[in-house]
């Protein structure tokens, strides 16, 4: 089964033309096509499809991709399979946040292994009845992928556990990584079988499928793709230990929107992108964006919620009320503390038990009156660590019960057998306090469920003997290290490693006044009830639509091989400068202006040697000696340095310190801009910069005649960036009344006079030539960073003005493929030099062909 656009492409290639009239979207009956993704691994095809075939879709559709389908399967005694929705699945619950007219398709694995002979039939049934597309993973491959790479490498690492010994996650296994890639490719196959790439949205969930965005982006450059990580994202110091760290980061950056539960998780991801990929981010109007090859990858911070109506419906069940009554009688005259956790090493069950033990030791009066009910769900992974946690938990429970128990009283009730959902709900209802002491967790929705259940309903109030009009109450003790903690402002937050603090929190939760319990509950209930799973899904989809809004107007193409693949997305008018084209224009024009940046344009960024090479000097001399040319080199460097470096270029004009100083091309003295009256502000700014230099290792101050620059190129990227933001705010504050601008650049903060920029040189050149009655018919302007954008803006805005010939050729060229006001680009400084050399060679050829007796035009001076 393939997408309609893909089928159309095959038909066109074979000459089988059909009518492409719009029709209602429909699914093929059976997903049976395999091997669709084979071209993704062919590096010869790395320049993937730039634009996808027009779709015949009329209805919005979103494809939800997760490790598991929200489907339950059951095989009866006759061996026949039946399927039903898994109402507990988050992927199913998020449908409540979708628009009514949005169709939802699911792709994922089934929990049960399906025989090969049954797969076609199962696929057809799931597609027709549930709009689900199953991904079938061979058992051995699934074991390596899920229990291997996901659970032995990613899961521990994302929860801050390093494989320091073979028992702690194990050493990195390349075969498990290959299995992870293979499974992600299978998922990509399934997506491509059903997607209409121009219209459909794709939402990928969790760490199991982190490389899927690359495979999808490689096939469809404009795919509308969101990714949400449901686990923590570790700090860069932890994440950087992963051998495939860059591959995973680059894969995620092929999404349009990346979602995290908390700011901490997003901050760690951004830090990793900065430290390992050299990417910077910007926050604008509350949205965080990473610029990545012309694409803006949006970062979304959005904690997930719960499905409230489902909980309320279960609260209304008769069996729930019966179970609540049973538990009320079981724990009569006792206060119940409740813990609900998976049986794994990160949930902190043993820490909770130790705190309970200490509570009963320090407060003998609570013996017989307080019970901890610990519900331990089966672990999702398997291994030695799970067995150790289970053994430790059972041993600790046994010790506490033997020490403090008595007939009719069991201090800790451990429930390690699966409970039905209504049974768990009943425990929420009767619990005085809910305890979550995980040492690291993604979101953890247990506190949210507890809050809604404590709100109750009239029937439950009657069952447990509460006045229906009485205010509801609840208490939460939560770990600082779980995703829901920042959202629960009324909870008692604890460091679970501090047993004393957890014990004190448990005691306080038991003795706090009824009024405070009610106040905390009301605050939590208001938040949880308004930030449910529907709100979460709706907000994510809205942001995804915004993030993909400019896809159609961008020109996209793929570069890079394998997992290094990425898409360059640029304005349609932005294209690579053809050297043949510019040389041709150069030859047929007579009044030419050439404006050149230096650092990053004439010399490679980060080079140890920054002085011009002999080749560069020769090229500049050849160009500037042509009487038809006016050539200016415009730099941020000071005039003394430029004078020294280009002393042999007699006909070269210079612009120093971003155009504040200009030396005309006749070799006369430097001229100074009249925009600035004084530099008294330096006495204020320099001490501030010096303070930040002393406290930021690796930073330096560059003092110019007209500007001060604080550079943190060699400082820690995160700390340097943080210090730069603070320094900028500090400088803006102390220099409010001074005529200066404080700007950030590439790892620098610069203070300079207002109105001084490289555009001044371009403006003066155009004005002077117009006054002389010589209209320019050729302009070349080349630069590589933000400071050069002012030159680009001036010459592009002069296109139809009086300073240029009506047939003027304008070439604004930046270095590298990136967003710019320039209309052309060349890949690097080597291509810039090659282009300039081509123009210089044209001068030599023309000179050789000119009659020696011909009159040489007088060179214009500026």
Curated annotation (Swiss-Prot):
Keywords: Glycosyltransferase, Phosphoprotein, Transferase. Residues 60-546 are annotated as: Glycosyltransferase. The modification Phosphothreonine is found at residue 32. It holds the Pfam family Trehalose_PPase. CDD domains: GT20_TPS, HAD_TPP. Low expression in leaves, stems, flower buds, flowers and siliques. This is Alpha,alpha-trehalose-phosphate synthase [UDP-forming] 5. It comes from Arabidopsis thaliana (Mouse-ear cress). Its EC number is 2.4.1.15. It comes from the Eukaryota. It catalyses: D-glucose 6-phosphate + UDP-alpha-D-glucose = alpha,alpha-trehalose 6-phosphate + UDP + H(+). InterPro entries: Glyco_trans_20, HAD-like_sf, HAD-SF_hydro_IIB, HAD_sf, Trehalose_PPase. The lineage of its organism: Eukaryota, Viridiplantae, Streptophyta, Embryophyta, Tracheophyta. NCBIfam families: HAD-SF-IIB (TIGR01484), T6PP (TIGR00685). 2-deoxyglucose, but not phenformin, enhances the phosphorylation of TPS5. GO terms for biological process: trehalose biosynthetic process. The keyword Transferase applies. The modification Phosphoserine is found at residue 5. The gene is TPS5. In the N-terminal section; belongs to the glycosyltransferase 20 family. In the C-terminal section; belongs to the trehalose phosphatase family. Both Ser-5 and Thr-32 must be phosphorylated for binding to GRF/14-3-3. It is an enzyme of class 2 (transferase). GO terms for molecular function: glycosyltransferase activity. Induction: 90-fold induction by sucrose after 24 hours and by heat stress. PANTHER family: ALPHA,ALPHA-TREHALOSE-PHOSPHATE SYNTHASE [UDP-FORMING] 5, TREHALOSE-6-PHOSPHATE SYNTHASE. Binds to the phosphopeptide-binding site of GRF/14-3-3 and to MBF1c.
